[in-house]
Amino acid sequence: MTDELKSYEALKAELKKSLQDRREQEDTFDNLQQEIYDKETEYFSHNSNNNHSGHGGAHGSKSHYSGNIIKGFDTFSKSHHSHADSAFNNNDRIFSLSSATYVKQQHGQSQND
């Protein structure tokens, strides 16, 4: 083998490894974005359920708080809570929506469904 051919083969092997590493990093990134989305859903669902079920907490006590870190706790001291006021929508997802690639990915999946 000539030196040029050896150099070419070494670069080719390095490129293959780099592409494999990139795919693994993209998979890890996608998994992290999905985990963020799932945690947001869990947070909003937990707060929504506690606000309206009348039961919450680890000891089954009644929950009287209302709100979350996104919308605030303005109704904290009010005794009547409106389900419509505390229901969350996708616009509340400040963490997962901050990733342009995740938004594009979700938009592409919804068009394919």
Swiss-Prot record:
Domain of life: Eukaryota
UniProt-listed GO biological process terms: chromatin remodeling; DNA repair; DNA-templated transcription
A Gene Ontology term for the protein's cellular component: NuA3 histone acetyltransferase complex
Residue ranges, annotated region (Disordered): 36-64
Keywords of this entry: Chromatin regulator, Coiled coil, DNA damage, DNA repair, Nucleus, Transcription, Transcription regulation
Main location: nucleus
Location relative to the cell: Nucleus
Keyword Protein transport applies: no
UniProt feature coiled coil, ranges: 1-43
Other remarks in the entry: Present with 504 molecules/cell in log phase SD medium.
UniProt subunit comment: Component of the NuA4 histone acetyltransferase complex composed of at least ACT1, ARP4, YAF9, VID21, SWC4, EAF3, EAF5, EAF6, EAF7, EPL1, ESA1, TRA1 and YNG2. Component of the NuA3 histone acetyltransferase (HAT) complex. The NuA3 HAT complex has 2 functionally distinct forms that participate in transcription. The NuA3b HAT complex contains an additional subunit, PDP3.
Similarity field: Belongs to the EAF6 family.
Function: Component of the NuA4 histone acetyltransferase complex which is involved in transcriptional activation of selected genes principally by acetylation of nucleosomal histone H4 and H2A. The NuA4 complex is also involved in DNA repair. Component of the NuA3 histone acetyltransferase complex. The NuA3 HAT complex has 2 functionally distinct forms. NuA3a binds H3K4me3, through the PHD finger of YNG1, and acetylates H3K14 at the promoter region of actively transcribed genes to promote transcription initiation.
PANTHER family: CHROMATIN MODIFICATION-RELATED PROTEIN MEAF6
Listed name of the protein: Chromatin modification-related protein EAF6
Gene that this polypeptide is encoded by: EAF6
